[in-house]
């Protein structure tokens, strides 16, 4: 997940310690997944406790031991969170290994500043076209559909349809209980609101250039469980693509 540009985010900075602690407490209370990134890796964590009296906050170890070792060796880390309708971003200096409720955890100073960005759009990750991921279900008139996923975010997603294919929806029409299959990353049943259709050229697995329609949808609502599942899936997809790109570059 990319960070917000330096030129645009300064208007969203918060420097009041009480406000920063309140935001961190909300993340803790809602058990919101946070992404921790540094020069040598990234992992998903949860904020466990905020301790303003000692100017510390505690967050959980990652699920992979080597990721935790790399994090402890990092001089600076960035924490990015994307709760519904917002993006939160701040940096931490060197972490400490502590015990919290008899389990290993990280401790860091409460950040001196934090960016709280109200967003209409979320970080969007492109979906690999081979193997394809699909969204399927029924139109309001009862006919079935199955489209290839183009990209996805916590705010919505794009689908590819062959140009000229029948699409019985108008602006603001809703698809109920659409099955979004992210393969090993989960199957989600979601309500989708249609936004627009645009022509786009794509290259298929045979190397052929095709003109398709990109159908844009937004999610009408996400339950906390759906949001957490999608956030994890998006993170893993982005991580997978980064690893493929790095492997390709190393092979040049």
From Swiss-Prot:
Its main location: other. GO terms for biological process: bacterial-type flagellum-dependent cell motility; regulation of bacterial-type flagellum-dependent cell motility by regulation of motor speed. Coiled coil: none annotated. GO terms for cellular component: bacterial-type flagellum basal body. The keyword Nucleotide-binding applies. It comes from the Bacteria. Belongs to the YcgR family. Acts as a flagellar brake, regulating swimming and swarming in a bis-(3'-5') cyclic diguanylic acid (c-di-GMP)-dependent manner. Binds 1 c-di-GMP dimer per subunit. Increasing levels of c-di-GMP lead to decreased motility. Monomer. Interacts with the flagellar basal bodies. This is Flagellar brake protein YcgR. The gene is ycgR.
């Amino acid at each position: 997940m990319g960070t917000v540009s330096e030129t645009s985010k300064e208007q969203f900075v918060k420097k009041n310690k009480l406000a920063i602690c309140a935001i961190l407490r909300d993340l803790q209370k809602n058990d919101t997944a946070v992404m921790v990134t540094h020069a040598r890796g990234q992992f998903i964590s949860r904020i466990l406790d905020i301790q303003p009296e000692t100017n510390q906050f505690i967050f959980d170890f990652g699920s992979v031991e080597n990721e935790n070792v790399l994090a402890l060796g990092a001089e600076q880390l960035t924490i990015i969170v994307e709760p519904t309708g917002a993006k939160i971003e701040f940096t931490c200096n060197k972490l400490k290994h502590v015990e919290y409720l008899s389990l290993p955890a990280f401790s860091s100073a409460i950040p001196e500043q934090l960016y709280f960005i109200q967003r209409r759009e979320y970080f969007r990750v492109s979906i690999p076209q081979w193997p394809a991921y699909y969204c399927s279900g029924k139109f309001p008139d009862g006919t079935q559909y199955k489209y290839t996923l183009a990209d996805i975010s916590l705010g919505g997603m794009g689908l590819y349809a062959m140009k000229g294919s029948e699409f019985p929806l108008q602006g603001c029409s809703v698809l109920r209980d659409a099955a979004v299959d992210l393969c090993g990353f989960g199957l989600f049943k979601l309500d989708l609101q249609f936004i627009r259709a645009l022509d786009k050229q794509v290259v298929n697995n045979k190397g052929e250039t095709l003109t398709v329609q990109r159908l844009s949808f937004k999610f009408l609502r996400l339950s906390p469980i759906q949001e957490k599942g999608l956030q994890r899936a998006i993170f893993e997809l982005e991580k997978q693509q980064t690893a493929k790109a790095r492997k390709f570059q190393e092979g040049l």
